[in-house]
Amino acid sequence: MKIYFKMVAVAALCATFTSCFKDEAPNAECDIEEAFVSVSNAKEVFNNLSDTLLQVPSTTTDLTFQIKRKATVTNFAPQFKLTEGATISPANGSEHDFSKEPVVYTVTSQDGNYSRVYRVSFKKASVMVGDTVKFDFEHYVKANLTGLADFYKWQEKDGEGMQDVWGSGNAGFSLSAWDQPAEADPAIPIDGFDGKAVQLTTRSTGSLGKLVKMPIAAGNLFYGTFDLRNALADALKATQFGHPFNRKPLTVTGYYKYTPAKTVTDRASKVLEDVKDSAAIYAVFYRNHDDSGQKVVLDGSNIKTSNLIVAMADMDYVEPKEDWTEFEIKFKYLTDIDLDVLEQNGYSLALVFSSSKQGDRFIGAIGSTLCIDKVRIICEKEKK
């Protein structure tokens, strides 16, 4: 029987929180938790040895190993850490040719009742064409984790199809919104300035949210991934910000509309008198490996404070606007970039949009709405 996350199920939810949400857990779990690969000449194939290991968020089914542009190896034998008792087909550690298309793996739960499909790719680092990277938010789908409500997620198209590069709190919101349609999500598609856009709205998480002192869900969308396993245990760790980016960003532009709601509350649902809600629009460019060579992904706890941050573009005050309004934010660099590190995909870019700036700490006004469209990252032109 499926768990539907009513108030009486909170204790069970915290104990059985996985992406196959069944009350038969753990034998109904069917996830890849880690993926790793071993090759004899790893330094010739990967930019960093840590790139041979992928930590897999619970909402992710497309796994991509990034390899060097000049790498000639096409056959790999990836291995997977699975949830307890699960099996995988093709066999764990079997060798395949990844040169033409992703290899599809199916993970089946120990009890045989549930399964999940993953696509695994080995991709050479791509060179971004032109000096402007465009995000128009035209591609979105409804996703579903077993036992939860449908929710919207956004994708970007590349040479191999649609890629899940955008994260949002929609999957986490679905924990408390099991009886609501996807249109009630904090992040939904709408008609935009041109084509489609994203509407971000701060929502109530209902009785369940209040019980665990997470009474609101700010509408957010970010260039990164959302790790559902941390949504209750450590909400700040659930937002994994950024993807490798091999250009030097100079400016972020786009269009927005913003209407703040009036009543701001805190984590205890106490009304904060004389406090106004505000939105967040910012970007962070950072080194994605530390001094010891370990892979780093910034999260909600350090996205603005990490010593790995190289540059930031922050729209400190998002002025309320009823009509589509153009914005432009310039990156402020704290240090020079290393061109060799840039060439090796050693920097990541995070873009963050939120209807309530302090929503990560569950402070905000239910109903505050931020709409975003036609975002552009203007980069330094490649020197010939």
Q: Model-flagged regions — what are they?
A:
Residues 188-208:
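Short carbohydrate-recognition loop motifs
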Residues 21-135:
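Beta-rich interaction/scaffold domains
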Residues 125-169:
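Extracellular carbohydrate-recognition regions
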Residues 122-124, 365-384:
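Exposed low-complexity, polar/acidic, P/S/T/G-rich flexible segments that act as propeptides
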Residues 270-282, 325-369, 374-375:
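Extracellular beta-strand ligand-recognition surfaces/modules
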Residues 290-343, 365:
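Extracellular carbohydrate recognition and processing domains
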Residues 16-19:
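C-terminal motif of bacterial Sec signal peptides marking the signal peptidase cleavage site
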Residues 207-291:
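Extracellular-facing segments of soluble proteins and assemblies that are Gly/Ser/Thr-biased and enriched
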